[in-house]
Amino acid sequence: MSGPLVAVTGATGFIGSVLLKSLLKGGWKVRALTRSPRVDDEFTQWIEGDLDNLNALRNLVKGVSAVVHCAGQVRGSSLEDFVHSNVEGTGNLVSASIQQDLPPRFLLISSLAARQPELSWYATSKRMAEQLVIDHSHIMPCTVFRPTAVYGPGDKEMSPLFRVTRLGILPMVGQPSMRFGLLHVNDLVAAILCWLSTRIPVHGVYELDDGKPGGYDSQSVAAIAQEVWKRRVYCIFLPALLVSLIANINLWSARLLNYSPMLTPGKVRELQHLDWVCDITPLTLALPNWQPRIGLRDALSQAI
């Protein structure tokens, strides 16, 4: 493959797959990490391996101009589960990158959860991964994106909620005063493309949502859903004690039966947190060509 290359992890996941399509459409050549064999083409080279495979990671980043690290673990039954993938895996990728004669610019797709690392094992691991990346910014240009909840066609986290909402029920955990940001996957990918295209590498940690002032709350989401789907939508706040009980049972069942749970006590604390609204001003200053363009009202009918 000739021409500028970008290395991508997580290219088979929700965000990574949308990014891959956009990169190819934009004329980039991509080298991507994959766990299972895939067929190369003129513009995409697949490197078989994972974040534990140091040789695969060296092959992934060899000669690339940029690394976009989308891969990460969102389910787990212990802090160690998350640290292994999100921290140690990131460390392996950083190590492979800084060993290059000309280290590439490096972008970590983290999570807004890292802003509150005390809430969950996931949030802790994301914050640790961020710090690891930033600690190497004197060797290679490093950037961290902290997107809020990302949704869009194909996502497995928000789409089920939207499907239930279409039936007239918006289930929530926490309090009516909670506020949160949302981000369409296309706007996140657009920010990544802008980051790649800057002549001078961008440094720092940046939050991303759709830019709605003050974010959303349960009532505003319900109102938008009513407008889009032309039916009444009722907000139902699930009892906190019941949700916590289910989360604890799920965690212990996961440890007993050896599966990776999504609903854990830490996830419940994330869901109950009062403020997940972003300030995107720093990123719009760093990337003047980026502005979020898709609000929930625009995307809800296609989000499921």
Locate predicted features.
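NAD(P)H-binding glycine-rich loop region in Rossmannoid oxidoreductase-like domains
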Residues: 38, 44, 48-88, 96, ...
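Conserved catalytic-site region of short-chain dehydrogenase/reductase
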Residues: 76, 112-121, 150-155
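Mid/C-terminal beta-alpha module of Rossmann-like enzyme folds, strongest
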Residues: 198-262, 294-304
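Conserved Rossmann-fold NAD(P)-dependent oxidoreductase catalytic core, especially the SDR/UDP-sugar
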Residues: 69, 88-127, 143
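N-terminal Rossmann NAD(P)H-binding glycine-rich loop of SDR-like oxidoreductase domains
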Residues: 6-26
